[in-house]
């Protein structure tokens, strides 16, 4: 077994050593629940990495959105370059679920656009879990949605090795059995080609880097090469490789044959139920739809919406569907990042899905078994937990009640302390805010201002600009690239102020920000709860001059609690710094991260591919643009804003050159 190797030039510091030790001791004692209560900027991710390394167990890290999950994924990839760090999030760029609106008698067909690159990462995730133990998976709520049987997937593995006695036809049959398709054209992902005594395959779990070439002589494998997927260049030989099914929804054909009579039986029962209750339209509708699906299953082993029959096809007697958790070994560790947000999100997934599908069942669009293709109920999710560490600066009631151990991580390795908080009455707040902005601009520092509505953020930005302040607003109506550019402008000092609404959702941890101004801090609601206020205060915790100003009419309970908790932490941090003679220093974060060698190589390949495209060779326009768009999304999620803008420009350049080439 390969051990986890943590790659870092730093050792745990501040409260990290204590937190690591206490969490590890709790886990080794067999406690199921523990909480890491770490302030913003205290290095919670590094603490998690050390726990994984020390306990040497597979780990699942779940976050509440794709952006934060991508940031964690990049950090863990850097921490563990020699281990399998995988990424498992929803692969839909667009998703309109199948639904029925009774009031309008409107049936809406399922529509979806799948992100191929994300799908590859998902397949790589289950492949890694099937092959090895040194695996860290960073995931979102997708981790509790239905997947195929882990046993079927693991049993799909086929090994090919030099010296193996096997014919081209036998290899071809195995590939087809694993859902790969033969192509007579250029090799593509999920396909294989045969030319004489050579067979090539591009595994679904490979990220485009390479494929395999198997050379045979008299029904014996004599050589296996790793080759470039696009150029077919030889990348070296290997003695063997293992191939898994191209999808984690592996359904043996015998299961399909066994499922058909069960589906027919339930169809008759449900149709009879509709007829007995005078629902003749529903009975006829269901009969037509399911009989068509059954015919497709008999002929091809597949049908549209096959996931709605997963209860019959899985061969499992379980009352819940399989999910990502089932692919992990029993001793895995779960880390729930930002647990105060993530746990409520997990809790709410089942009910929304159930109510939508219940309409489909009640009105004859689906069999009742379709209700079993669903996310886990919260108690099912909880039952699948082996041992968990909840991670949050502001853990909720559930984490505090369940955890046998709650560990504070208050002291930052940088010596930075929580910001000072000043409360000011809202009378004359605009003039006061303008004055404070001017002070920060003079020091070449930045300002974040949080409002309650989009209209307020736009109006305030317009007002500040009219006074000569370099300001931009930031909210959900801006697309990804526009948000990227606004943040990039702030970091490069081309603007001094960002006015936003939910700055937590934007994931704004910008060390240049020394002032956070909270307007209407006393208003009751989600954005001004104790938890949200503490999290917002943390936006100023990465600068040694951090200051928070709360503008109010009447000091609210949430304000008082947030101020008291922040002051408690601040005092502990100040006392520690005095005792250890530490001078806090603002975090230095490069404005433009120099691209790693890997990305530089990719960019060189991009230029090469542009020429290939223009001359009509190799990679198609659609594939290359999709590849660049995926890299753009990764750059945005990693906060590599300069890289994102470069990639955006390359996409525009490619589209332009293709257009010119076609017009010649």
UniProtKB/Swiss-Prot annotation:
Q: What is its main location?
A: cytoplasm
Q: Which GO terms describe its cellular component?
A: cytoplasm; excinuclease repair complex
Which intervals hold domain UVR?
Answer: 622-657
Q: Where is the Helicase C-terminal domain?
A: 429-595
Domain of life, source organism: Bacteria
Question: Which InterPro entries does this UniProt record tie to the protein?
Answer: Helicase/UvrB_N, Helicase_ATP-bd, Helicase_C-like, P-loop_NTPase, UVR_dom, UVR_dom_sf, UvrB, UvrB_inter
Keyword vocabulary terms for this entry = ATP-binding, Cytoplasm, DNA damage, DNA excision, DNA repair, Excision nuclease, Nucleotide-binding, SOS response
Gene Ontology MF term list:
ATP binding; ATP hydrolysis activity; DNA binding; excinuclease ABC activity
| GO biological process annotation, one example | SOS response
Annotated binding of ATP, by residue: 38-45
Q: Which Pfam families match?
A: Helicase_C, ResIII, UVR, UvrB, UvrB_inter
Domain notes per entry: The beta-hairpin motif is involved in DNA binding.
Give the function comment from the record. Answer: The UvrABC repair system catalyzes the recognition and processing of DNA lesions. A damage recognition complex composed of 2 UvrA and 2 UvrB subunits scans DNA for abnormalities. Upon binding of the UvrA(2)B(2) complex to a putative damaged site, the DNA wraps around one UvrB monomer. DNA wrap is dependent on ATP binding by UvrB and probably causes local melting of the DNA helix, facilitating insertion of UvrB beta-hairpin between the DNA strands. Then UvrB probes one DNA strand for the presence of a lesion.
Q: Which family does it belong to?
A: Belongs to the UvrB family.
Quaternary structure, per UniProt, is: Forms a heterotetramer with UvrA during the search for lesions. Interacts with UvrC in an incision complex.
Q: What is this protein called?
A: UvrABC system protein B
Biological source species: Borrelia garinii subsp. bavariensis (strain ATCC BAA-2496 / DSM 23469 / PBi)
Q: What is the lineage of its organism?
A: Bacteria, Pseudomonadati, Spirochaetota, Spirochaetia, Spirochaetales
């Amino acid at each position: 077994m390969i051990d986890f190797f943590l790659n870092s030039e730093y050792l745990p510091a501040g409260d990290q050593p204590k937190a690591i030790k206490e969490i590890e001791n709790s886990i080794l004692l067999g406690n199921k629940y523990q909480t890491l209560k770490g302030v913003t900027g205290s290095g919670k991710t590094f603490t998690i990495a050390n726990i994984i390394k020390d306990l040497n167990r597979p780990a699942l890290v779940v976050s509440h959105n794709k952006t934060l999950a991508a940031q964690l994924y990049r950090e863990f990839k850097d921490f563990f370059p020699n281990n399998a760090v995988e990424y498992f999030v929803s692969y839909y760029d667009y998703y309109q679920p199948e639904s029925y609106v009774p009031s309008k008698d409107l049936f809406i067909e399922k529509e979806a656009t799948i992100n191929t690159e994300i799908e590859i990462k998902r397949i790589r995730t289950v492949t890694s879990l099937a092959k090895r133990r040194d695996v860290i998976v960073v995931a979102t709520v997708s981790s509790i949605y239905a997947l195929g049987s882990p046993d079927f997937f693991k049993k799909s593995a086929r090994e090919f090795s030099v010296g193996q006695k096997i014919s081209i036809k036998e290899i071809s049959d195995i590939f087809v059995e694993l859902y790969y398709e033969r192509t007579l054209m250029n090799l593509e992902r999920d396909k294989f080609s045969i030319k004489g005594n050579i067979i090539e395959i591009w595994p679904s779990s490979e990220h485009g880097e390479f494929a395999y070439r198997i050379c045979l002589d008299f029904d014996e494998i004599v050589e296996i090469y790793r080759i470039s997927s696009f150029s077919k260049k030889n990348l070296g030989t290997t003695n063997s490789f293992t191939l898994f099914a191209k999808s984690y929804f592996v359904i043996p054909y015998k299961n399909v044959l066994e499922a058909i009579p069960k589906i027919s039986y339930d169809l008759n029962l449900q149709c009879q139920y509709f007829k007995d209750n005078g629902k003749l339209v529903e009975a006829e509708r269901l009969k037509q739809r399911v009989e068509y699906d059954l015919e497709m299953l008999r002929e091809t082993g597949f049908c549209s919406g096959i996931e709605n029959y997963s209860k019959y096809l899985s061969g499992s007697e379980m009352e819940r569907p399989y999910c990502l958790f089932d692919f992990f070994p029993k001793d895995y560790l779960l880390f729930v990042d930002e647990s105060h947000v993530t746990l409520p999100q997990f809790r709410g997934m089942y009910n929304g899905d159930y109510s939508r599908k219940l309409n489909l069942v009640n009105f004859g669009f689906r069999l009742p078994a379709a209700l079993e293709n669903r996310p886990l109920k919260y108690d099912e999710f909880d039952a699948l937990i082996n041992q968990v560490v909840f991670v949050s600066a502001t853990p909720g009631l559930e984490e505090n009640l369940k955890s046998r151990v709650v560990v504070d991580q208050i002291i930052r390795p940088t010596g930075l302390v929580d910001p000072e908080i000043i409360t000011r009455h809202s009378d004359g707040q605009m003039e006061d805010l303008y004055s404070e902005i001017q002070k920060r601009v003079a020091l070449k520092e930045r300002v974040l201002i949080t409002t309650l509505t989009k209209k307020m953020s736009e109006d305030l930005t317009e007002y500040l600009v009219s006074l000569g302040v370099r300001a931009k607003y930031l909210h959900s109506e801006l697309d990804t690239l526009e948000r990227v550019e606004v943040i990039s402008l702030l970091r490069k000092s081309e603007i001094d102020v960002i006015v936003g609404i939910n700055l937590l959702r934007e994931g704004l941890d910008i060390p240049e920000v020394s002032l956070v101004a909270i307007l209407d801090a006393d208003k009751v609601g989600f954005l001004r709860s104790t938890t949200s206020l503490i999290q917002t205060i943390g936006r100023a915790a990465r600068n040694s001059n951090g200051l928070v100003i709360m503008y109010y009419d009447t000091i609210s309970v949430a304000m008082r609690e947030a101020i008291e908790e922040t002051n408690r932490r601040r005092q502990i941090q100040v006392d520690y710094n005095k005792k250890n003679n530490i001078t806090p220093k603002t975090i230095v974060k490069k404005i433009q991260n120099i691209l790693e060698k890997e990305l530089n190589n990719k960019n060189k390949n991009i230029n090469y591919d542009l020429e290939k495209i223009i001359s009509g060779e190799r990679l198609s326009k659609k594939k290359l643009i999709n590849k660049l768009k995926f890299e753009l999304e990764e750059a945005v999620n990693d906060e590599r804003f300069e890289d994102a803008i470069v990639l955006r420009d390359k996409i525009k350049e490619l589209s332009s050159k293709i257009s010119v080439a076609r017009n010649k």
